[in-house]
Curated annotation (Swiss-Prot):
<feature type="transmembrane region" description="Helical">
    <location>
        <begin position="360"/>
        <end position="380"/>
    </location>
</feature>
<dbReference type="InterPro" id="IPR036259">
    <property type="entry name" value="MFS_trans_sf"/>
</dbReference>
<keyword id="KW-0472">Membrane</keyword>
<feature type="transmembrane region" description="Helical">
    <location>
        <begin position="179"/>
        <end position="199"/>
    </location>
</feature>
<dbReference type="GO" id="GO:0006869">
    <property type="term" value="P:lipid transport"/>
</dbReference>
<dbReference type="InterPro" id="IPR039672">
    <property type="entry name" value="MFS_2"/>
</dbReference>
<feature type="transmembrane region" description="Helical">
    <location>
        <begin position="449"/>
        <end position="469"/>
    </location>
</feature>
<feature type="transmembrane region" description="Helical">
    <location>
        <begin position="277"/>
        <end position="297"/>
    </location>
</feature>
<keyword id="KW-0813">Transport</keyword>
<feature type="region of interest" description="Disordered">
    <location>
        <begin position="1"/>
        <end position="26"/>
    </location>
</feature>
<feature type="compositionally biased region" description="Pro residues">
    <location>
        <begin position="1"/>
        <end position="12"/>
    </location>
</feature>
<keyword id="KW-1003">Cell membrane</keyword>
<keyword id="KW-1133">Transmembrane helix</keyword>
<feature type="transmembrane region" description="Helical">
    <location>
        <begin position="140"/>
        <end position="160"/>
    </location>
</feature>
<dbReference type="GO" id="GO:0003376">
    <property type="term" value="P:sphingosine-1-phosphate receptor signaling pathway"/>
</dbReference>
<dbReference type="GO" id="GO:0015293">
    <property type="term" value="F:symporter activity"/>
</dbReference>
<feature type="transmembrane region" description="Helical">
    <location>
        <begin position="223"/>
        <end position="243"/>
    </location>
</feature>
Length: 494
């Protein structure tokens, strides 16, 4: 589940300007190229999916660092990813073209570094006093490096071919592969570490409040991290072998658009964009809170720890399978009508907090996946309409589409950072004990609030803002065909 990237992602779009619909034969991409391009985005989704569901549980129960330090690690990591977005676009835009292109060296160069950062994020160091600093540093590094990969990788779509149709096809391959990576990440990681958090974990310990960490548990997490990290060199090799960046013959001309901060000042005054961004600040933060606390809730606030892996799998499978359905609903009934699909999870989340039983949990997992799918699909469907509306009212140079997308990602990442940081800090105030088998009643109540009331309130607030906000005007067909096609090149989720 993913996001756009890069304030001014290097040479994109204009180099190959071509009338829509003119699909020259020499602009076609082979199926092999599209598949290899799609595979290149898999590792980031695998890693993001695994960390979204299991990182908090690992930091509290295995690394056994205080909840306040977990809060700092999550907040710092998300903020570093948000800040890295415009920074990456700036440096990539300033870089020179090499023999392998301008974007490919950045994407391929980041991959081994991301793999190392990800592995050490799940490694249990021998010392205990500085573990909080260890995990904060590596999570910040992982998020920043992942962004430095994703910016050039998504921008690469625009200079693979001059054909808009082939660009759309390459983007479809990428998003399909990324959805598969999202599903694979949490599934593989969960299967490897499932025995570490079963109901038998505390049965043999004489100190159930805070059992020692078994070396086997630490080893399982290292194995899971190594498996995920290995996807980076494997997929990176296929990306390098199967995809060739085309020459950008007009990069200087394409770089004369708005810079990020000037463009942000202009776009932030556009009412439909403000409505969309503010509404999905709440909705995306609610989804991240729901994802992050489901595993903790099942482990410490209910007796569902043996069902965690199945519940995570159901959420992801239902999200992937329901995406085509939501695409049809968007076309058939309209985008604002489809937004009501997000609130389907609200009553079920409250039901799970009130009645934490296995049958209820499985139903909630399925419905949550369906709602998460539309919450991820809807903003990327509405943003192009907002961009079209803005371009009809203003005459701006190239780069404005990128500013819309990158600023949206920037703000949603910051909202996720704040939501996860504050919510995890609330566990500290409730008296959460790192590594404890049995948490205090205050912690159990807090987890129920975080899994039920908090996402519910945030989703309802976001939907109200979205539904009462201004609707962008739809351009005429002839005008729409002349608007930039660059907007379809970003996005991926976590």
């Amino acid at each position: 589940m993913s996001v756009p990237h890069g304030p001014t992602p290097a040479p994109v779009a204009e180099p190959h300007t071509q009338e829509p619909g003119s699909d020259k034969r020499d602009g076609r991409l082979s199926v092999c190229t599209k598949v290899c391009y799609g595979i290149g985005g898999v590792p980031n989704q695998v890693a993001s999916s695994a960390s979204a569901f299991y990182l908090q549980l690992f930091l509290l129960d295995v690394a056994q660092i205080p909840a306040a330090q977990v809060s700092l690690a999550l907040f710092g990591g998300k903020v570093s990813g948000a800040v890295a977005d415009p920074v990456a676009g700036f440096f990539i835009n300033k870089s020179r073209r090499t023999g392998s292109g301008r974007l490919m060296p950045w994407a391929l160069g980041c991959m081994p570094l991301i793999a190392l950062a990800y592995f050490f994020l799940w490694f249990l160091p021998p010392f205990t006093s500085l573990r909080g600093l260890w995990y904060t540093s590596f999570y910040c590094l992982f998020q920043a490096l992942a962004t430095f990969f994703q910016v050039p990788y998504t921008a690469l779509t625009m200079i693979l071919t001059p054909s808009p149709r082939e660009r759309d096809s390459a983007t479809a391959y990428r998003m399909t592969m990324e959805m598969a990576g999202t599903l694979m990440g949490a599934t593989v990681h969960g299967l490897i570490v499932s025995s570490a958090h079963g109901s038998q974990r505390c049965e043999d310990t004489v100190h159930p409040r805070s059992p020692a960490v078994s070396p086997d548990v630490a080893r399982l997490y290292c194995i899971a991290a190594a498996v995920v990290a290995l996807t980076y060199p494997v997929c990176g090799s296929l990306l390098c072998l199967g995809v060739k960046e085309q020459p950008d013959t007009s990069a200087p001309a394409s770089g004369q658009g708005l810079n990020f901060f000037t463009g942000l000042a202009i776009t932030s005054q556009h009412p439909p964009y403000l409505s969309l961004v503010v509404s999905f600040l709440f909705i995306s933060a609610a989804v991240q809170v729901e994802q992050s606390y489901l595993v903790l809730f099942c482990t410490h606030a209910s007796k569902l720890q043996d069902h965690v892996q199945n519940l995570v799998l159901i959420i992801l499978v239902s999200a992937v399978l329901s995406t085509p359905l939501w695409e049809w609903v968007l076309q058939r009934f309209g985008k604002k009508t489809s937004a009501f699909g997000i609130c389907v999870m609200v009553p079920f989340s409250i039901l799970l907090a009130a009645v934490p039983s296995a049958p209820v949990a499985y139903v909630v997992a399925f419905v949550s996946g369906v709602s998460i799918a539309v919450s991820l699909l809807l903003p990327w469907s509405m943003l192009p309409d907002v961009v079209d509306d803005f371009q009809l009212q203003h005459r701006c140079g190239p780069g404005v589409e990128t500013i819309f997308y990158s600023s949206y990602v920037f703000f949603t990442k910051l909202s996720g950072a704040g939501a996860l940081g504050i919510s995890t800090l609330s566990l500290e105030f409730a008296g959460c004990e790192a590594g404890a088998c049995q948490q205090a009643e205050e912690v159990v109540v807090t987890l129920k609030v975080l899994i039920g009331a908090v996402p519910t309130c945030m989703i309802l607030i976001g939907l109200c803002i979205l539904l009462v906000g201004p609707t962008p005007k739809m351009p005429r067909q002839d005008t729409s065909s002349q608007l930039s096609l660059r907007r379809r090149t970003s996005y991926s989720l976590a």
